[in-house]
Amino acid sequence: QKCSATSRVYVHQSVEEEFIGSLKKYTEGLKLGDPRERDVFLGPVIDKKAKETFTGAVELTRKDGGTVITGGRVRTDGPFSRGYYPEPTIATGLPRGHSLERRELFVPFLVAGTFKMFDEALARANDTEYGLTAGIFSEDEAEVDAFFDRIRFGVCYANRRGGATTGAWAGRQSFGGWRASGSTGKGVGGPYYLLSYLREQSQTRR
C-alpha cells in the first residue's frame, strides 16, 4: 500500500534463476501480522476492496498462464481473523504486456519478468500510464545513464541497496510522479514545487 513500493521487476535472463530464487527466499521470510509489533514487516491491507484486488490478481495470473511462486493466499487463521492479510506474493511467467504489469494494485503483489536486451527492459518499464518511481541495478555506467535519460518516471534510483524504488529522503530529494502519477511533473520538495503555492500578478502603471 506504499505508493513507491516495487510492483514489478525485470531480470536479465542470465541471472534469472539465481535472482528469482533469492527473491522468493527473502519474501518468504517476511513476517505478516500486527504492524504495531517491531518484527512485523507487513500488516493488513486497508479494506475488503483491496483484498479483492489481491485475490483477483492471483486468479488472473493463473488464468493467463502465469505462476504464483510464493504467497497467493489471504490469511484468516488466528490473529489474522480481524482484517485482511494477503501474503507477500510473487508472480512469474505472465505474457509480455500483461495488464498486471501495467496497473497500480496497491497490494503485496509483485510481477517478475525476464529480458534479453536493455532496450527491451526499458520499453517494458515505460509501458504503463503511471510514472512515480523506478530503479535499476547495473554495473554498466552507460546503461545507468541511458536509464536516467529515457525512463519516464519522476523519482528514479540506481544501485540503491536501501530500496530499489522507494525511500526518498525528505529535504534532499524531490518527490513526484509523471503522467497518471502526477499532475504537474514537479516534485514535492523541489525548487519548482514552491511556485505552485505562489500567485503571479502583472502590474502596469501608465
Feature map (PLM): residue ranges:
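Short secondary-structure boundary segments
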Residues: 13, 72-73, 159-162
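Conserved core segment of the aminotransferase class I/II
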Residues: 13-31, 195-202
